[in-house]
Amino acid sequence: MADLNPEIFNLEVTNHELVKLAYDAYLANSRSSHAKTLKRGEVRGGGKKPWKQKGTGRARFGSTRNPIWRHGGVAGGRTGEENFTKKLSKNAKRIAVMQALSMKNTKKAIQIIDNLGIKDGKVKEVIKTLTDLKVTPKNILIVIPEKDELTLRATNNIAFAKVVRPTFLNVFDIMNADTIVIVKSAISALDNWLIGKENV
C-alpha cells in the first residue's frame, strides 16, 4: 500500500464552503443556454392595432402581441445567450480537490492499487480487479497516470466507473464517487499537480 501525502489526503476540513463553490462551479460551467423566448417584436402577427385609441372605454393597446396579452411576447425572458460560467482560481480549485479527497479518505472511500490488471484491453479484466477489491459496483472513480488505448478499451463500457488522469480530477466527480481507486503510479503526478511543485 502506497503512503498517501497527508498534505492532500489528511486535511482537516472544518468548512465545506470552498468544496461547495467548486461543485456548483462545475455544474454551472457544464450548463449551456438553449431556452429562448420570443419578445413582442419576434412573435408573428400583431401588426394591426386591435381597436381605436379612444372612445371604446377599453385600455389602449397598439398590438395583440403585447407581453400582457395571451399569445403575446415575453418580457425579460431567456435570450439563448445567457452565460452561466462561474470562475474559480486554479489555486482555489486545487485546494477544493484536496479537501474533497481528504473528506473521502476520512470515510475510507479511497483505495490504492498497483495496476488495473489490463493485459488485452478487456472489460472483464477491470471488472475482476474491482471485484477483488470488494468495492460496490456503483459510482467508482479510477485515477490513472495516463490514458492509453488498452485502458480506454477496457473501461469505456463500464457504466458505473469513470477513468480520469490526475490533472482532470474535479470536486464534482470526487464527491459523487462512492469509491475512488487510485493506481499507484498516478500518485506522484497527483502530488505534483496539487501541491504545485511542477505542472504536469
Residue ranges of each PLM-predicted region?
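A short, flexible low-complexity segment enriched in Lys/Arg and Gly/Pro that occurs
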Residues: E17-K54
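Glycine/serine-rich anion-binding loops at beta->alpha junctions
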Residues: R40-G77
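Extended polybasic, low-complexity segments that bind anionic RNA or targeting/receptor surfaces
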Residues: M1-S32, T79-V200
